[in-house]
From Swiss-Prot:
Tissue-specificity statement: Expression detected in spleen, testis, colon, heart, smooth muscle, kidney, brain, lung, liver, brown and white adipose tissue.
SMART domains the UniProt entry points to: RAP
InterPro entries registered for this protein in UniProt: FAST_2, FAST_kinase, FAST_Leu-rich, RAP
Name of this protein: FAST kinase domain-containing protein 5, mitochondrial
Taxonomy, superkingdom: Eukaryota
Keyword list, A-Z: Acetylation, Mitochondrion, Mitochondrion nucleoid, mRNA processing, Phosphoprotein, RNA-binding, rRNA-binding, Transit peptide
Record gene name: Fastkd5
Amino acid sequence: MSAALKLLEPLKYKAPCNPAYRAAQSVAHWHMGNITPHGGQTLPECNSSCHLARKVKNVGGTTLPRRTFTASSAHLGLEFNKASTLNASTLHPDSSSAGGGEEDVEVFDSFEGTRVFLKLRPEYQLHSYNRSDTHQPIAASEVELILHKVTFYQNKLQPEVITNYFYKLSSLPAEQNSVLLSSNSFALLCQLSVKNIQLFNTSDLISILKAFVDLRIPPSLSMLDVYETRFCHQVWEMTLDQLLLVADLWRNLGRRVPRFFKIFFSYLNLHWRELSLSQLIHLIYIIGENRQVPQDLMQRLESLILKYVDSVNLEEVGTICLGFFKSSSSLSEFVMRKIGDLACANMQHLSSHTLVHILKMFRFTHVDHIHFMKQFGEIAPQRIPSLGVQGVMHLTLACSALRILDERVMNAVAASLPPRVAHCRSKDVAKILWSFGTLNYKPPNTEEFYSSLINEIHRKMPEFNQYPEHLLTCLIGLAFSEYFPVEFINVALSPGFVKLAQERSKFELTKELFTLDGTVAIECPDYKGNRLNSHLQQETSANLWNLASKDMRSKPEFLETLYLLETMLGGPQYIKHHMILPHTRSSDLEVQLDANMKPMPFNSEATPTEDGAQLRFKQVGVSLTDDLMNQLLKGKAKRYFQGQIELETGQPPMELRKKTTVPLVNSGCNGTDRLGDGMVGLCPLAHMQPPLVKLAIQFTNKNQYCYGSRALLGLHNMKRRQLVQIGYRVVELPHWEWLPLLKRTRLEKLAYLHEKVFTSAL
């Protein structure tokens, strides 16, 4: 409450108002029609300080000669120069592209395209502003008269007159705005509005702000700071419709107003229950464009979404998703499933951009609405060719984030990209390569697809200086798919780029650099280019091990697995939990077997020492005989293991077991074991033979596979590929087998682990 009350205190601000200045040449020379000099002679050329530009016609058929003025209009930051007016016009793209065909597909008006929902309910007109609404164009003679009055009367102008002048001038045809903004008289009008700003009521302020939008006032002008401050004072005296309208006008103007929104959000914390459906949707849109919002407010708005969810249309559903996504605000799984259900009911009528917005939110919340994704897979291949590459990127990225491999979608993406790859940003190239690599999928046109994207990386190299994370994403995505463009790798691992990535990117990229470096070391033995320095390698490896170790040891199922393996093999010295390949960011359980396929006590970290000389190991392993295995593998368990073993080896389990049953005794160490009763033997570590087999036991979970399948994702598939390359045999304890077995008896678990370890060793 105290935080909210602080916002009620008046904000201190200064409205710098210089005395009204004389402007002998301040009035623009507004001329009517086709006026020519006496005698029909053409006008002589003006000098560089005041030249006639080409004439442009207004709607009424009159023309205004465009002039530039020598007098300064820098009061209050009113630098209405050519560059600023051009920039202002780009912030309000309201003209369609003259191009056609492929170009039209890539042209998306991100401003108007996200405001379609405002046209679908009449209620939105109460709290939004539509610049396309037509005004009766003002005559050039009236413009000239207004500007003359501004110059002549100056300080005698009343606030309501100033407001009226702005309103009338805002009806000027858009193509003549730059002429008006170049006028010293208009600069004087703006100065007078600032000087009298405390005399304007809320309606006046809103009217002037509308005029600023219509006239495309450059959003960077310092004059607008004064207006933001004044609106901050007015927040608690305004209605919800007025507040939303003001916020929408700032959005139309293209200016960020963080102070206004801070107070506006405080107001909403007290009045959020009063929001109507149209107000709620419009507010979520505005929040998304603002990018920042208190999360407690978003939680309140989520409850209102549930209240209105059955009344929203499809475009409003897309607006909800985009607003929450842009503001990095999550929605509950329940709400996301409701949204998915709404979309599924009308999937064919869903616009492509709304589809993209919904997928963004599914990606952000990691909600797997399978029915939605199935329907998406049916319509996406037809939509993708007519969707811009940025939209295609978001569709592809959503599939990879949700681990859903739909070959129809991926093939459509791969087929559509090569002809228009030049339209990709560096971000698009990176995310698409990452997505295909993550899903471990190679489309039918693999060669064309990858060669076009790799060539585009070359063309985008200057962009990577600004966005180094995108180059690393490209290269790691390519590595998942076994592509290693050494030219780019050499750049990415160069000292200069490493420094750039660590200093200039907003992301922590050390892990990405480490992953790329470790991958190159294994998979590119002939590579002679740049590598990370040893200090950075060791530091990153230690950090990753701390994270991986903490994560795995927080999982009870992993701890039980580790304990059972230690029991089966003979103690902690026979198994080691560590990161065999630190750059792959996950840990392993390593077991080493000698020439007789018996475990070796190689883990010195878990071995007690006596006087630093000999290492003594206690054999506490379990001898698994055929009789014991028969007792364990009865009923359902027996059928399960028998089916799995026959499937994987093609041999009946009893025949295989005769080959693989290994009594854990006499492996160079004397001693005999009983179940739970062992004797101690001496095994000097220095006399141990090199291991014949090194096993990397993988404790997996569902997030390492494509959804609903047993196909590994890119990083985990790459890790196994590299483990094999450095001489390990991978033993997988798949979650679909091992996790259900954890509920069974201890002996059944030991039997399963014995089969896995020693069958893999063959």
